[in-house]
Amino acid sequence: MAEKNLPKDLTENRKEIDQIDRKLLNLIHERSKLVINAGKIKKKSGDKTFYRPDREASLIKTLQKKNKSSIPAENIKFIFKEIISACFTLEKKNKGLLSRS
């Protein structure tokens, strides 16, 4: 079905989804800037261990508990593990020399 032939309410719904996606992208960008800054702070303080699996697990568990959507907890875990992993890679790339332990 061509976009122009879609019912108006579906078109409006998709526009709202697109707006939310842009907001999510902006929030991920803001998160990535904070992660990079945290990495700089850690580097400056001499903290060479920047990956903390216990913090990641705690964060994900908290997010799963706060989840009020119909998205299953396992999917929430997957989504946030991906976001954390992408930010971890970015932090590692920007810091350059920290070890993962």
Residue ranges and their predicted role:
Residues 1-101:
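Domain-level signature for soluble enzymes in the chorismate/prephenate branch of the shikimate pathway
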